[in-house]
Amino acid sequence: MSMVQTVDNVALLPAYLAAGTAVLVLLADLLVARARVTISVAALGALATAAGAVLVGGGGERRTFCVGADCSYVFGGRAALVAVLVALLTLGVLGLSGPLLRAGATPVGEYCFLLAASMTGGVALGAAGDLITLIVALETLTLPLYVLVGLRRGSLASIEAAVTFFVVSVVATTLTLLGAALLYATTGALHLGRLGALFAERPELLDIPLTTVAVALVVVGLTVKVAAVPFHAWAPTTYDGAPLPVAAYLSTVSKLGGVVALLAVVQHALPAQITGLVLALLAVLTMTVGNLVALRQRRTVRLLAWSSVAQAGYILAPLGALALAAGRTGDARAAAYAAAVAYTVFFVVLELAAFAAVVALRPAGADGGTLDELRGAARRRPWAAVGLALALVGLAGLPPGLAGLFAKVTVVRSLLDGGAAGLALVVAVNAVLGLAYYLRVVAALWSTDRPAVIPTDPTAVPTDPAAAATGPAVGSIDPSVALVRAKPVAVVLAAATVVALVVGFAPQLVLDLAAR
């Protein structure tokens, strides 16, 4: 067998575009030094990356870095879907970042560069064909986030959140790398397909205690990335301490990366006899604990964080069924895989819409505030309140949020087809439990108990020349750092809402892509 690797630069085009975006952002910040130009370069780079992924993915599966039949980078339908999602979510987060960057507490060049660098890891992650490529891509996605979380000047909460996130992520990465090393020691393979074939051909490998330890370490390390219970404690603290756009990125792109990595190893590499029961148990714990703790939350972002934990449980459930269905029909396994991918797509779109609405309801650069501050918000900013309500109703799985409804139906159906009726019942019970806190927030938006604690609209710039010359009066809100200007956030919120409605009325679009 030849040890010379083949290289297909077309397969690498989306990754090239993402990495090139990061370089161009640095050059724009250095040479032009205008925030608008830097942000525009990052946004155009994200669009180019998405377009490149569609172009390459539409031409069939492409493999590169191959030695014999084993390839380290495989760009096909799933990789294209992941790359497009990562690029468009990055574009959406850039749209939400305008008020944060205008507030002046966060350097624009560094912020956009870190987002582009993280996007590069996400684009490469979906195409990873071996454990090392997968881990490196996942860390390329995650490493810039440590800095992004703590990049806001003068914020102790951001620094604490960054340290928490860093420590937990380093431990998770260490466990994953150790598990990969032990797997190599027991099997002599790192490529995902080769690992799966070895475990199928040589079942005696499963009797080696070191194999069980290795698989457990890899699974634990990756479940930390999706904030699965009991490895979830970092998520609420990190989300609440991070700037709102960064919290949105953590809740969407970072979560997507963890799910993609976990799905890759469960579907192709790790033995179902070990991973199936572990993932099913983690799914039950994650969705139950996430929903129960979310009921007690009084801060907006913490509620969304715990909701994200619960949603991770719904995603893990079909992954557990996928492994448990190893001895069942190929259709059952395919349904479980498609359900996990489809649910993740529905979730990240709705989550982006929810964070966009919260950004629209908060002062520039502020945190998410408390639920009490959302009371009566529909009277002042009805478009943002409607967007938040639709997103939360969708996450709850109720009409008109049909995306969330079909996501949960898809998960339950895949569990039933895979013979995991008990797990399907737990999902159904938790879906009902989640209604309580989602609908509580929706009701608060239209509450008349007290006016919403929301500053004045920043677009209402004083027209009095004297007022403009002397600046804002004492106790008033400076328009440059008050509520977000409606346009960029409204575009992101409207786009996310429209996408959620489209896939809600035509879920087969996502299911067909997920099944590729």
UniProtKB/Swiss-Prot annotation:
Catalytic activity, EC: 7.1.1.-
GO MF, one example: quinone binding
Membrane topology per record: Multi-pass membrane protein
EC main group: translocase
Organism: Salinispora tropica (strain ATCC BAA-916 / DSM 44818 / JCM 13857 / NBRC 105044 / CNB-440)
Protein name as annotated: NADH-quinone oxidoreductase subunit N
GO cellular component, as recorded: plasma membrane
Its job: NDH-1 shuttles electrons from NADH, via FMN and iron-sulfur (Fe-S) centers, to quinones in the respiratory chain. The immediate electron acceptor for the enzyme in this species is believed to be a menaquinone. Couples the redox reaction to proton translocation (for every two electrons transferred, four hydrogen ions are translocated across the cytoplasmic membrane), and thus conserves the redox energy in a proton gradient.
